[in-house]
Amino acid sequence: MYHDVYTDGSSLGNPGPGGWGVVSDIYKLCGGQPNTTNNRMEMTGILRALEECVKRDIQEVCIYTDSNYVKQGITQWIHKWKKNGWRTSSGSDVKNKDLWIEIDTLRNQ
């Protein structure tokens, strides 16, 4: 089964209170956190969408997001991060490592 999913996330302040949303033709999800960042909310929306797809046994999914951070992270940076033990090229920990690992695990199921 093929599935299109639309996600978004935002925060008021960075950090600040934030929320995320997921919309598809078969489900809608939303949530938030009191003290978070825009990027974490963008990623949480995608993470929740992937969790729902796994739960519903949806094998192919196309996720639409306006976040260049997430797009580049998933399509370009994540391969290098994994190879480097979740460290950047400068040797520091990848920001939002916990969410990147969860997203990577789910997208490979």
Describe the predicted segments one by one.
Residues M1:
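Post-transcriptional modification and biogenesis factors for structured RNAs
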Residues D4-P17, L47-Q109:
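RNase H catalytic domain
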Residues D25-E42:
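A short, polar/acidic, helix/strand-boundary loop motif
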Residues V5, W20, L29:
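A broad, low-specificity signal marking well-ordered, structured residues that form hydrophobic/aromatic
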Residues P17-S24:
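Acidic, metal-ligating active-site segments
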